[in-house]
Swiss-Prot record:
One of its GO terms (cellular component) is cytosolic large ribosomal subunit. HAMAP family: Ribosomal_uL6_A. GO terms for molecular function: rRNA binding; structural constituent of ribosome. The gene is rpl6. PANTHER family: 60S RIBOSOMAL PROTEIN L9, 60S/50S RIBOSOMAL PROTEIN L6/L9. This is Large ribosomal subunit protein uL6. It holds the Pfam family Ribosomal_L6. Keywords: Ribonucleoprotein, Ribosomal protein, RNA-binding, rRNA-binding. Belongs to the universal ribosomal protein uL6 family. InterPro entries: Ribosomal_uL6-like (IPR000702), Ribosomal_uL6-like_a/b-dom_sf (IPR036789), Ribosomal_uL6_a/b-dom (IPR020040), Ribosomal_uL6_arc (IPR019907), Ribosomal_uL6_CS2 (IPR002359). Part of the 50S ribosomal subunit. It comes from Methanosphaera stadtmanae (strain ATCC 43021 / DSM 3091 / JCM 11832 / MCB-3). NCBIfam families: PRK05518.1, uL6_arch. This protein binds to the 23S rRNA, and is important in its secondary structure. It is located near the subunit interface in the base of the L7/L12 stalk, and near the tRNA binding site of the peptidyltransferase center.
Length: 184
């Protein structure tokens, strides 16, 4: 099989966003805030000019090709996050025992889940993630897609039902909508 000479991925930078590259650390600043991330990979080089970020690898093997695509996606998500932000919407569902959900600092507390006396807790990941509860709707917003997604998963996993038939006991907090929305 013939090896490719190089693979280059180009990511456009919007006008409101600034990308700074220091070695393998990429910093993206925009209206929503700032995200830093270290992409330490031996063969891959990341460079930028005013308009584009370039991710390049010379004589790649299969893993290097995959890593170039992964780094491109991460940088694209960072740029989109600081420019627009990410919003996940969840719905509180219960049949008999009305659960109450509260945000206390960096913890989401779920009381009275299936009538349990002890509250269930979910951790909010990252400093930029905001969780709000209005009625039966839970909204998670932030600029880092990974932190927003992991916080959503933590809340969903906190209400996982064990030892009961999941076809009957469908109480929980479930993802309803994933959106990339404009920052206010």
């Amino acid at each position: 099989m013939v090896k490719l000479a190089d693979i280059t991925e180009i990511i456009p930078i919007p006008e409101d966003v600034t990308v700074t590259i220091n070695g393998s650390e990429v910093t993206v600043k925009g209206n929503g805030g700032e995200i830093k991330r270290n992409f330490n990979h031996n063969k891959i080089t990341i460079s930028n000019d005013e308009e584009n970020v370039t991710v390049k690898v010379a004589f790649p093997n299969k893993k290097d090709k995959a890593m170039v695509g992964t780094i491109r996606s991460h940088i694209s998500n960072m740029i989109y996050g600081v420019d627009h932000g990410f919003t996940y919407k969840m719905k509180i569902v219960y049949a008999h025992f009305p659960m109450t959900v509260k945000v206390q600092g960096k913890i989401v507390t779920i009381d009275n889940f299936l009538g349990e006396r002890s509250p269930r807790k979910a951790k909010i990941i990252g400093d930029d993630v905001k969780v709000s509860v209005k009625g039966e709707d839970v909204t998670i917003t932030g600029i880092n897609k990974e932190h927003v997604g992991q916080t959503m998963a933590n809340i969903e996993q906190a209400t996982k039902i064990k030892g009961r038939d999941p076809r009957i006991f469908q109480d929980g907090i479930y993802l309803v909508d994933k959106r990339q929305e404009e920052l206010e």
